[in-house]
């Protein structure tokens, strides 16, 4: 069963200038990401490269463009196990995703989440990680699986971080 998610809807200028623009206008709760207004849900479903924000070892924010996925009320972050961001996520499991409409930078969704668990591709049930990677490969490239960007020099293994959504902010219109 999907969890309730708090949504903060920022006021924007799509309908003209207004008092308090760019501040939070309305708040609501929805059940799962499927409960988002369609103008924001569309951003999640399109092959838009997100910006992932996380805290690096020096305490500064690290921003990484990457692919993402979601299922119900969980965000899925799939990365190679040998990458630095994998260790940073393990050290501080609080993440922020920003999904900006490439056709209108004043239309975006921000998702703050916390890693609940990780799935390892080399674990007995690791085929879940591979299937999810193949799914986003097709979403973002249009190519049939398998995922075609594995590092050929190493035996690259993947990690799937399953994240609970803490809150969502929305802004603008398409």
Model-assigned labels for residue ranges:
Residues 22-54:
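Short, conserved active-site entrance elements at the starts or edges of catalytic domains
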Residues 36-38, 63-64, 82-84, 147-149:
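A generic local structural motif
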Residues 1-35, 107-174:
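Charged, gly/pro-rich active-site loop segments
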Residues 44-45, 90-91, 154:
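Alpha-helix boundary recognition
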Residues 47-81, 87-89, 97-100, 108-111:
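Short beta-strand segments
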Residues 100-102, 165:
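Short secondary-structure boundary segments
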Residues 43-46, 105, 157:
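A short, polar/charged loop/turn motif at coil->beta-strand junctions and beta-hairpin connectors
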């Amino acid at each position: 069963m999907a969890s309730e998610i708090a949504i903060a809807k920022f006021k924007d200028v799509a309908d003209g200038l207004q008092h308090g623009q760019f501040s939070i206008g309305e708040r609501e709760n929805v059940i799962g990401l499927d409960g988002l207004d369609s103008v924001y849900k569309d951003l999640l479903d399109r092959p838009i490269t997100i910006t992932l924000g996380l805290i690096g070892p020096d305490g500064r924010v690290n921003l990484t463009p990457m692919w993402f996925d979601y299922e119900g009320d969980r965000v899925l972050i799939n990365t190679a196990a040998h990458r630095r961001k994998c260790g940073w996520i393990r050290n501080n499991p609080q993440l922020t995703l920003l999904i900006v409409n490439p056709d209108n930078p004043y239309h975006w969704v921000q998702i703050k989440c916390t890693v609940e668990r990780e799935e390892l591709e080399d674990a007995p049930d690791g085929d879940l990680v591979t299937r999810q990677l193949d799914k986003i490969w097709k979403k973002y490239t249009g190519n049939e699986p398998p995922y075609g960007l594995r590092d050929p020099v190493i035996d690259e293994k993947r990690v799937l971080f399953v994240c609970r959504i803490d809150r969502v902010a929305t802004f603008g219109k398409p």
